[in-house]
């Protein structure tokens, strides 16, 4: 598995021109976000290149965009011998597609967790609750033979 850097200042750089294109400052974007995304935290997130997936979705929403992501298949991996029991109840749908990507390659949560030095239940917790850092999403995708790809899509104009 390739090493994924938690601090990758380039990871979130693509959103900076989008924020400015909407005439927003980092402080103004923070004011438009829900209270969990504090104003001073946005420059920090961009500087370190990491944030929670849910925070990324909230920042996109506040700037008038939609946060979208997918995993691109980049290499085969050994399927697991275990029964793949999917996560079936979700507190957040944000990471729900991860289960579909894992099922395509017949990868169980315990085996994915083992590749990352975590338990299957820790991976299941991330997916079920939608609590995952962007860097953790990259690591999970890489361990499963995928590449994590994300973007902010423009929302259609409301007439």
Protein language model annotation of sequence segments:
Residues 28-33, 108-113:
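Short alpha-helical "recognition helix" segments of helix-turn-helix
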Residues 1-24, 68-70, 75-106, 149-151:
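A short, Lys/Arg-rich alpha-helix, primarily the initiator
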């Amino acid at each position: 598995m390739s090493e994924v850097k938690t601090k990758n200042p380039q990871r979130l750089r693509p959103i900076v021109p989008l924020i400015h294109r909407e005439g927003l400052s980092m402080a103004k974007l923070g004011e438009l976000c829900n209270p969990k995304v504090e104003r001073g935290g946005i420059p920090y997130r961009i500087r370190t290149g990491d944030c929670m997936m849910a925070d990324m979705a909230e920042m996109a929403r506040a700037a008038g965009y939609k946060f979208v992501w997918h995993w691109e298949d980049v290499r085969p991996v050994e399927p697991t011998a275990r029964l793949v029991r999917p996560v079936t109840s979700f507190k957040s749908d944000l990471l729900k597609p991860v289960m579909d990507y894992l099922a395509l390659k017949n990868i169980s949560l315990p085996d994915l967790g083992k590749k990352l030095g975590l338990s299957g239940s820790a991976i299941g917790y991330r997916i079920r609750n939608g609590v995952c850092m962007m860097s953790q999403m990259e690591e999970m995708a890489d361990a499963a033979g995928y590449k994590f790809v994300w973007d902010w899509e423009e929302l259609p104009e409301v007439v």
